[in-house]
Amino acid sequence: MNGTEGPNFYVPFSNKTGVVRSPFEAPQYYLAEPWQFSMLAAYMFLLIMLGFPINFLTLYVTVQHKKLRTPLNYILLNLAVADLFMVFGGFTTTLYTSLHGYFVFGPTGCNLEGFFATLGGEIALWSLVVLAIERYVVVCKPMSNFRFGENHAIMGVAFTWVMALACAAPPLVGWSRYIPEGMQCSCGIDYYTPHEETNNESFVIYMFVVHFIIPLIVIFFCYGQLVFTVKEAAAQQQESATTQKAEKEVTRMVIIMVIAFLICWLPYAGVAFYIFTHQGSDFGPIFMTIPAFFAKTSAVYNPVIYIMMNKQFRNCMVTTLCCGKNPLGDDEASTTVSKTETSQVAPA
């Protein structure tokens, strides 16, 4: 084996020379230079400085402006809440551990950090599934004149949390486990060892199939149907130009969120799957560290996309920041993507 396995860790470094120490007890500077750990800490500090204000602002602006409290926005706000969980439960912990060069909070802290990171990522993925289904139901009308209302949005939010917990909670109760990964300063699911005591392999397969592949299949199916329906409706001019424009805007926004999610999480998922299928092979700590830390940017990009592509929310945000005045002079009451859940676009 090209790594060293302990009772609650796996270090991707052979202990033939006797230098390997538990990532819960001693700095891991034999894995990487101290300055590299400092770079990780600086990166986490940047994500905290960006992730907390922009997600908190998303929640605050919505509370301040009643017009933003639409069913579709409930799902988008759910993403902001999940991102804040990642910032407080994961990023702050990883910042501190990176400064020390090892996971100073012990196995319990590792469980909490891994749980919050997994929970946030899964809430984001299942929120995108709910958004994709909402777009499919609203635009393609498979259920006649069904309207996506507040109760449906609340059920959608509850669904995302149930599914996310179904992925993040089992390692806390004995099905798989959370262990330090990469440079041993952040924690994630154990892809590295079979660890028969916790039936680790069965959980990893379950997670990849149920909590990654199936959601992506649903998302791609919904948007494939949606693109076809919108083109057909536009060709037959079934809707007004204003309605079609609004539907295209909200659909474009959600599709960009999906693309951003894939850019952030596919490298991590790909590396994790490779490690899982090549357990014991030779790979360095950087191999998992880079995609793991890159995936954490997901806590920043969703609100940025939302703010950039939603004119009404952007205007409300500017009004809030400028103490009730909007220097841009845009009309907040204009038709926007956040109010398109009552769309009447129908299939051909």
Swiss-Prot record:
TM ranges: 37-61, 74-96, 111-133, 153-173, 203-224, 253-274, 287-308
Taxonomic source organism: Bos taurus (Bovine)
Glycosylated residues (UniProt): N2, N15
Cytoplasmic side: 62-73, 134-152, 225-252, 309-348
Annotated S-S bridges: C110-C187
Result of changing G90D: Increased thermal stability and decreased retinal uptake. Decreases stability of the inactive conformation
GO MF annotation list: 11-cis retinal binding; arrestin family protein binding; G protein-coupled photoreceptor activity; G-protein alpha-subunit binding; guanyl-nucleotide exchange factor activity; identical protein binding; opsin binding; zinc ion binding
Gene3D superfamilies the record matches: Rhodopsin 7-helix transmembrane proteins
Family: Belongs to the G-protein coupled receptor 1 family. Opsin subfamily.
Localization of this protein: Membrane; Cell projection, Cilium, Photoreceptor outer segment
Motif position, 'Ionic lock' involved in activated form stabilization: 134-136
One of the GO biological process terms: thermotaxis
Modified sites of kind Phosphoserine: S334, S338, S343
Name this protein carries in UniProt: Rhodopsin
Site features described as Plays an important role in the conformation switch to the active conformation, chain residue numbers: E113
Pfam families: 7tm_1, Rhodopsin_N
Lipid-modified sites (S-palmitoyl cysteine): C322, C323
Gene that this polypeptide is encoded by: RHO
Reported function: Photoreceptor required for image-forming vision at low light intensity. Required for photoreceptor cell viability after birth. Light-induced isomerization of 11-cis to all-trans retinal triggers a conformational change that activates signaling via G-proteins. Subsequent receptor phosphorylation mediates displacement of the bound G-protein alpha subunit by the arrestin SAG and terminates signaling.
Outcome recorded upon mutating T94I: Stabilizes the activated conformation and hinders hydrolysis of the covalent bond that retains all-trans-retinol
Residues in the Extracellular compartment per record: 1-36, 97-110, 174-202, 275-286
Positions of modified residues (Phosphothreonine): T335, T336, T340, T342
